[in-house]
Amino acid sequence: MSGEDGPAAGPGAAAAAAAARERRQEQLRQWGARAGADPGPGERRARTVRFERAAEFLAACAGGDLDEARLMLRAADPGPGSGAASDPAVPPPARAVLDSTNADGISALHQACIDENLEVVRFLVEQGATVNQADNEGWTPLHVAASCGYLDIARYLLSHGANIAAVNSDGDLPLDLAESDAMEGLLKAEITRRGVDVEAAKRAEEELLLHDTRCWLNGGAMPEARHPRTGASALHVAAAKGYIEVMRLLLQAGYDTELRDGDGWTPLHAAAHWGVEDACRLLAEHGGGMDSLTHAGQRPCDLADEDVMNLLEELAQKQEDLRNQKEGSQGRGQESQVPSSSKHRRSSVCRLSSREKISLQDLSKERRPGGAGGPPIGDEDEGGEASAEHPAVEPRALNGVSSPVSSNPKSPVLPEEAPFSRRFGLQKTGSTGALGPSERRATEGVLGLQRSASSSLLEKASTQAREPRLARITPTPAQKVPEPFTLYEAATPPSLDHSVPPSRREPGSIVKPNVLTASAAPLADSRDRRRSYQMPVRDEESESQRKARSRLMRQSRRSTQGVTLTDLKEAEKVAGKVPEPEQPALPSLDPSRRPRVPGVENAEGPAQREAPEGQGQGPQAAREHRKAGHERRGPAEGEEAGPAERSPECSTVDGGSQVRRQHSQRDLVLESKQEHEEPDGGFRKMYTELRRENERLREALTETTLRLAQLKVELERATQRQERFAERPALLELERFERRALERKAAELEEELKALSDLRADNQRLKDENAALIRVISKLSK
């Protein structure tokens, strides 16, 4: 049965197989017919994905597929008969494929060095790849190998002509990027062998830019040279890299500070981004806009490094201030100019304070030549202009008395080297001696200050304008004698000064400054006109009010004034040497020769000031003369009262004024004289002891006050120290908290680094898969 079934089954199986083959052939014929036929409008096939030749070559080299890379180079080579290969300016297509880069400027040779693939490096170098090709940051393949520490690749590149002096955009050589000692030793040995100057290599780019800029300046033309890819100018490069001298030359040649590159960056954007402070200052000084915007709408401060943020804010403020100054100067330029003559005119002396008047008088004395006549105050270059516009530019004493200027140009003027002759040998003239009748009538109605004969040079208007101002000065008894005392006493030799010292003069005596004579007036005439030097009084105060005020002041002084121990001793010395009342007065006690204390009003009231000089022969006048003589002879006879008179403790008693102290000294002299005549001195001893006890208690109080202040300071310091100690635990707790926070941050960063390593591995895997996919697609597309 098997033999019968075998022949029957064999033909059936063969027929089935033949039918299957026939169907397969039919399918192939139909598929070929459809593939060869043109597709219809609705049956168009999808376009095949095709990458650029450079991207395919980079992918093949990154994947290590050297056969595929070799086929691409062979396909790109046009052959010996093509015209492109014969042109030396145009690189061959195979060379263009070899040196092709991605968006970051990384070539296949860069990528092979990064991947440490020495086989691909050798293949590319043998095929003619550029060994010193730089990426967008200026890194060559040797920079990459040195940074990664690949000794074999570095040796191979150096053996095939790699430039060891190449500088990247940060100004670093491959030696500066070496990570290992072996790599550093290799590069140093190669530098020594080639004799490369490292510093000169780093300055090569700057020197080249400087040379080109000078050539442009000498040629008179500044070309608009731009980078073909970024559009950056020479000023952009110099600003970004800090080539200050190149920037100065470019700006001197008129280079625009608002030039834009491809991204809309100005040179100031580049300098701020790279943190070049000197470049930022230089560009800001030449009008670089702080508000210039890029194509992305960013200002220089938005792109700036953190180190130059404060500098940019300062430069922006300076630009704003300079702009405001220019606008203000332009506005002032349109206004009318002030006459230059008014800039040197001196203001009126009546508007100055007493201290300023004295300073002005000192300056005028220094300018005045010795022994020459003429006015002591006034600039010779101003002439009549100053006299016409400022008639009151006349040095005045503190109480308003005019300085000695004679109206007669022929009268002699004594030099400043002989002050004693002015004080003792000259007589005073009346203030109305040189005035006309009309002017004399006008000045009689004014209760202000009467001026000397020199005032005839002044105008009536300025006189009436100045005297009410001086009359408004309130002469209070509490007014201290200012610094003109020291100036007045310094101008007189001590050996010739027989006048009453300021602290020892009677309040009733009026000290008058000497005035140069215009005529030989007799002594009696000067006495009659003595009231012309009186202090100005207030117009609104009546005579009865002045008398009542003076009486109240005298009563208050007698009841409230205290006397120091020094004053008491001084009074005892003076009282011990009081001469007999029948002794005649000295000739120097003539009231007309007695100098007046400036700025001090007679506290006895106007009744004594207005007493006629004819009554000076009465008992009261004789007694006043004897008192003045006693006080004058005190310092002259060798008493040691000078230091006590000038000591600050004795200048004022219990806050009193100089005038009050003079009254106290006069009363003290009288009382001590009476006590000296009395045989019983018990009251004086008791008063002295009480006074000493009072002084001792006062000193103890002062020491206690100082001690209390010191204790307060020490208490404050202790409190602050305790507060610092109390705050220390809180500071330690804060430091511990910050330390824990930093530790947590470090742990998080470590975790992120681990995750970054995983991501890097995944990225590499995806890149490999992408390269394989590109190769598959390229093969299928063929």
UniProtKB/Swiss-Prot annotation:
Residues annotated with Phosphoserine modification: S403, S411, S431, S454, S509, S647
Keyword annotations: Acetylation, ANK repeat, Coiled coil, Cytoplasm, Cytoskeleton, Phosphoprotein, Repeat
Gene Ontology molecular function terms on file: phosphatase regulator activity; protein kinase binding
GO-annotated cellular components: cytoplasm; stress fiber
PROSITE patterns: ANK_REP_REGION, ANK_REPEAT
Principal place of residence: cytoplasm
Residues bearing PTM Phosphothreonine: T560
Localization (cell): Cytoplasm; Cytoplasm, Cytoskeleton, Stress fiber
Matching Pfam families: Ank_2, PRKG1_interact
Residues in coiled coil: 301-332, 681-782
Segments of skewed composition (Basic residues): 547-557
GO biological process: signal transduction
Listed Polar residues bias regions: 332-341, 451-465
Cross-referenced Gene3D superfamilies: 6.10.140.390, 6.10.250.1820, Ankyrin repeat-containing domain
N-acetylserine carried by residues: S2
Main function: Regulates myosin phosphatase activity.
Protein name (record): Protein phosphatase 1 regulatory subunit 12C
Organism, as annotated: Mus musculus (Mouse)
Source lineage: Eukaryota, Metazoa, Chordata, Craniata, Vertebrata
Gene name of the record: Ppp1r12c
